[in-house]
Structures are given as C-alpha cells and as structure tokens.
Amino acid sequence: MMKKLTYLILLLGGFFSVAAQSEELMVDGMRAYMKEDFGEAILVFEKLAKVQTQEPAVFYYLAKSYLADKQLTSARTNAEKAHLLSPYSFDYGLLYGDLLLANKEYKKALACFENLLAYDDHRFDNEPDMIRVKQFVFLSKGDEAKELADKNKYYLQAANLGPVQEELWVRIIQLDWELNRKEAVVEHALEALENYPRMAPWVFPILGDAYQALGNNSASDAAFDKALAANPKDDHVLNNYSYFLSIRKEKLALADSLSARLVADHPKNGTYLDTRAWVLFELKRYPEARIAMEAALKDKENASATLWEHYGDVLFRLHLVDKAIEAWKEALRLDPSRESVDKKIRMRQIPEN
C-alpha cells in the first residue's frame, strides 16, 4: 500500500511539474510575442507544442508568430492544427482561412469560412471580421453560381453587409442589366455612385441607358450629360445619346453635334456611322445620310439588318425606290422576322405613322 501511495505522489508531482512548466512557457511565449520578438516567441511556443500537443492556443500563437516573422508555410501548418483542435473557434478558423487565401487555396478557404458561419460563435453580425468572412463566402458563391439570378443574389448579399470593392458594384449592375432588371440597374447604380463618387464615368452612361429603357427621357438625358462632363470622348455615350435623341426626334442639333464628334474619332466604325446617318436622316439631310450609310456598310462585321433597313430608308427618301427595295430585301434576308421591312417591300414605300 505504501509503495502505491509513493508512486501516486511521484506521478502527481510530475504532472504538476509539467503543468507548471507549460504555464511558465506560455507566459514567456506571450511576453516575447507582445514585445514583437517573434524569433524568441517561435522558439518558446515550439518547445511548448511538444508538451501540449492538444492545446489549440499554443498552435494558434505559434502560427501568429510565424506569420509575423513572414514564414507563411509554417504559419499555415500550425494554424491548421489549431483549427482542427478547436473547429468552433472563430479566431482560429479566421487565421487559418486567411492563410489559405494567402496561399491561393480558395476552395479550402471557402469551406473553412462556411464552417465558421455555421457555428454559433456568439459574434455580432456587424463585427468587421464577421462581415469580411460573410462577404468572402457570398462573393465566392456568386462567382461559382451558374444562374445569373443566383450570382446577382449572392453579390447583393455581400454588398448589403457593408462597403465592398467598386468591382463588385460593376458586376451587380451588369447582372441587373443582363437580367433585364432596369429598375434594379438604376437603384444599384445610384447606390454605387453614393458610395464611390469616382465611379461617375462608368455609372452615368449605364444610368442613361437604363432611364431610356424605362421611358424616363429627361433623366436619361441628364445622366448622359453628366457622363460627357466626366468623359467628353466616351464613344458609348456619344453613340447612344445621339441615337436616342434621333429616334425621339428631340434635340436634333445636339444629336448632330454628338454624332459628328463620334465619327470624327471613329471614321470606320459601322455602328457609329449608322447612328450618324440616322441623325442626318431625321434632319432630312438625305444626301449626307447616304454617304454615311454607305461608309457604314463597308464595315462588314457590323453590316446588320438594321443598317440595311436604314440604308433602304435613306434611298427611299432620295426617290431611289428600286435601290431602296434591294436594301430592304437584304435586311430581310439577314433578319426574316422583321415584319416592318417586309411591309416596306410589299408597299414599296415607308409606311406613314
């Protein structure tokens, strides 16, 4: 009995000795870490890790010490150990996930962050790190989603959490446009502009297009005016603004000026020459419109059914009816669904509205 008691005392003494030594090493390691003596901290925590093999805090601070010392591989290895030992810890998982990102292991980082969000870590939703993790998850899911609507949903969830990069707003607004959600285009473009005023040269052109599609002509014109104030040579704006004015038969003098500037900078672009021709057509300057249209048709890649129909209209106004019908027939060949063109051919004239 006496031998057993002696053995137990010796065993407990050894245990308390190890515990005391571990506690002392932890204090020394933390002291070195706080003093930013990361080399010393690494030595201490490495020694401690050999004794406390199941203590996640040891590997966590060892990883942070390696990270501060710019030894990313060792930092990642120890952060993973801390995370595996305590998968419910937000801090351990966050460090591991960030190191995975630094190592471009994006899928593993996504899985790590998704697991963190699944745990009840008693974190507030508005904490910066929580927001950052959620935004990464939503952005990753958005990038992976195959359906445009799903992409848009995830990107918006990321944006609604707080400030995001300008690039994300561009993606959201472009998806709104592709999904034909013009009201959403306006809403999100204005929100992006409020958060990032320097996005004005990109936002105002798409606002002009969206307002025009929604039938808000005055807002469209105002947006295009602001776009040109930000970038007077924006060819997209010069083209769309002048074309929209021409089909509305409004501010034709402005449309004339804008389209002239456009083709001066892009003298061989068929689409832009077509816009110029149509402005001239609405101004009843038919000989000039014909010259512009024939130049547009030399751009074979952009010689669309629309261009051929417009060319036919110009020729008709010049009383070249047979040539007009030939042009309309070419338009119908390129796009057989154009009932308006078929009607022009059958009537041998442009129907009056």
Tell me what each language-model feature is:
Residues 30, 64, 98, 139, ...:
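Residue-level recognition of tetratricopeptide repeat
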Residues 53, 87, 121, 163, ...:
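Short coil turns that delineate tetratricopeptide repeat
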Residues 23, 57, 91, 125-129, ...:
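Start-of-helix register in tetratricopeptide repeats
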Residues 47-50, 80-84, 117-118, 159-160, ...:
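Conserved structural position within tetratricopeptide repeats
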